[in-house]
């Protein structure tokens, strides 16, 4: 497995998610050069100007430019945020047909440049579109990563932190499966400030109802946000920046992403949300969590849901 070289990033798609990611990236000073590609040239020009004016106050300088696909040739990463937007009431899986075609076009142009880095995909439905990018690119599986359940896990940790009045950084809990309606919480391995959530459940049976409500709020958060403001952006932008940092700083840190399975959880040939160790090679390894029989049953349902959609296109 080869390491990606340099800190240049090409961002494809400067909508709400893409710009939020670019803003987070600049504030964290991770890229030397951020080239942005978007079909709306006028709006892109305004975003590039606006971001560059903010770079003045960042801790380190990021050169932000209007990009072309030729910029991908020497990029360490290509981050895809482009695609048809999710409409109010529309599930992520309903976006498949439109966005698979968009991915095929984008990936063809990227690979024609000679790109040899890492793809990070955020377009929805992210698990299936990450699989599409892998198939269309011909790259090794570990160099194609989806944002997966990074945002869902963050939402879950935040809400658990609110319940127990601790910082989210002291909450260790994962959402796995599809980034969408069939995802599931892994309560069996979750800890709050080092205390097992399973142990808390044993002591307080009524806690189960509160946790189920928190999970439902986590799962449905995107629908509420989209209904209120049209799209999700800041949370996923920060999540993408976290994955980017893990890659470019070669951190070998476990992050909940969409990764290709090779027998983990008894599944293969699908991209799905699970913790994975990430570094400059992309995904070093998938982390297979020890989950209960009930959690496994729900995970299998999630995997089958994705597979049924995926097989219509691949």
Curated annotation (Swiss-Prot):
Pathway: Fermentation; pyruvate fermentation to lactate; (S)-lactate from pyruvate: step 1/1. GO terms for biological process: glycolytic process; lactate metabolic process. Keywords: Allosteric enzyme, Cytoplasm, NAD, Oxidoreductase, Phosphoprotein. Its EC number is 1.1.1.27. It is an enzyme of class 1 (oxidoreductase). It comes from the Bacteria. The keyword Phosphoprotein applies. One of its GO terms (cellular component) is cytoplasm. Belongs to the LDH/MDH superfamily. LDH family. Catalyzes the conversion of lactate to pyruvate. Homotetramer. This is L-lactate dehydrogenase.
